[in-house]
């Protein structure tokens, strides 16, 4: 959960912490009878490793911003894609595109392609990981981007990575095909 909190937000009458409110919302959503999503969060991950069965506690990132509103971006996802996470600290002369194209085939089908690649560039290892996860909250607008053309280096990278990864032919569920990333 990514939360943007306006500096002028007032929490009058709140009886729970914001973490508790978010976790209660996640708990209620995962316990709905019509929920088809798998619960995949563990209590005591270093010990008994029992499933909480409601995907709490949620992983929450906060950002304080100007204004008087609160904005939530929630990814209802399991941990399988996290298991395929890769991180590297590249030298300035190394190619980001080459590293991604070399790395995607090593992930096998466990990330359930076709999918999205969250790529965080810059900062510390921790910052890059958060940037990568946050990038997955963006709209899938690659067709619009291709139509209008890239306007900066990040947009050029997005198109180049998509084209080269799809050219690998990994396809749906790793069984081959034209579309590996969206």
What annotation goes with each model-predicted range?
Residues 9, 16, 20, 26, ...:
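Conserved mixed alpha/beta catalytic, RNA-binding, or beta-rich assembly cores of soluble enzyme
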Residues 15, 50-52, 56, 103-106, ...:
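Residue-identity detector for threonine
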Residues 22, 157-162, 166:
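Short, well-structured alpha-helical segments that form the helix of a local strand-helix-strand
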Residues 31-45, 106-118, 143-153, 168-182:
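Flexible, glycine/charged-enriched surface loops at secondary-structure junctions
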Residues 40-44, 52-58, 98-100, 163-168, ...:
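Short amphipathic alpha-helical surface micro-motifs
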Residues 128, 163, 170-174:
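Extended, composition-driven regions rather than compact fold-specific motifs
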């Amino acid at each position: 959960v990514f939360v943007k909190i306006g500096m002028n937000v007032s929490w009058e009458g709140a009886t729970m912490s914001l973490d508790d409110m978010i976790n209660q919302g996640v708990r209620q959503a995962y316990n709905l009878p019509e929920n088809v999503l798998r619960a995949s969060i563990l209590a005591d991950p270093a010990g008994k490793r029992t499933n909480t069965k409601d995907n709490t506690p949620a992983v929450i990132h906060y950002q304080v911003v100007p204004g008087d509103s609160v904005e939530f971006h929630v990814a209802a996802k399991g941990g399988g894609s996290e298991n395929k996470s890769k991180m590297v600290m590249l030298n300035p002369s190394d190619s980001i595109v080459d590293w991604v194209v070399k790395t995607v085939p090593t992930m096998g089908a466990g990330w359930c392609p076709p999918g999205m690649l969250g790529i965080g560039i810059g900062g510390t290892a921790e910052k890059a990981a958060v940037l990568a996860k946050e990038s997955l909250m963006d709209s899938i607008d690659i067709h619009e981007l291709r139509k209008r053309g890239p306007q900066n280096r990040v947009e050029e990278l997005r198109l180049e990575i998509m084209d080269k990864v799809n050219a690998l032919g990994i396809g749906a569920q790793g069984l081959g095909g034209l579309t590996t990333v969206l």
